[in-house]
Structures are given as C-alpha cells and as structure tokens.
Amino acid sequence: MDDLAGAAPENWYPRKTGMNPEATINDDRRFGGVTRLYGSDGAASLRRARICVVGIGGVGSWALEALARTGVGYLTAVDLDMVAESNTNRQIHALDDVYGKAKVEAMAERIAHINPACRVNCIEDFVTPENAANILDDGYDVVIDAIDQVRAKV
C-alpha cells in the first residue's frame, strides 16, 4: 500500500480502534475487489485521493463510508451537527452508542474500523458563504456537496 504519511492538518482525526494493534491488516484481502474492478493503478489513485464530503447526514454519511470502503486514503468530513436519535432512519452513523456525538467524529471512528489506513480530517463547522473558500480550498481532488441548507450551496 502507498505510504499515506506526510504533512497533514492538525485536525486530522487520531485513529482509535478496538482492533488488536498487533494484528496485521491485509489490504490485498480487504480491498482486493477494488483492485480487481479498477486495476492496480486505479486502486493506487484511490489511496492517494483527497476527498471532502460537506454535510454528514442522510446522503453524506453514506457517501463518506462508501469512499472509505473503496480504499480512499484521505477524507475530510465537514459538519457541525451532532448525531440524534431522529437520524436513525436515514444516517449510517446513527446508533445508540453515538447519539450526542459530533457527526464528523462518529464517522471518523467508524471509518477507522473499516479502513484503518484512511486519514480522516474532521471539520466541526457548517459551510457558509463566508467560510466556504477557506474550508474548501485545501487541494481536494473532489468535493461532495451533501449540504441540506440551500443558503450554503456554493
């Protein structure tokens, strides 16, 4: 697997998992389907990709997890909201043990169990017309707009 180390913003989530730290993760097994589908070069491109998902709700939470399961190496999650019980019917992170937790933090913890090599940058903020350029100008390959507030659409 490509080396994912390097300069990372200070707010990149420190990965915590319940996995045995002595355990070896076999990325060929874990992401072999991605390599078979997209080829070695495609899988390597995904490992190097920097993708930002803005809005970690009913669309964004599913998109963020799908990207992690595809082997994307760098993800940024942007949302200021907390996981609520009323999110359970539509948001992948809405589980009993995460109600009240920041959505971005809940997703970072979930992703650490799916793709431990993935670096997750958590930005606890809403995107507004005033801060959009600052949040979105970080060299992302792709930005996914999953915002539910029309005023914040950029």
Identify the residue ranges that each predicted region occupies.
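Glycine-rich phosphate-binding loop and adjoining beta1-alpha1-beta2 segment
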Residues: 74-115
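Electropositive phosphate-/nucleotide-binding environments in soluble metabolic enzymes
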Residues: 28, 36, 40, 57, ...
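Short, glycine/charged-enriched secondary-structure capping and boundary segments
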Residues: 66-69, 90-93, 135-138
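N-terminal charged helix/coil linker that caps or initiates catalytic domains
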Residues: 2-52
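A generic local structural motif
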Residues: 37-41, 64, 128-134
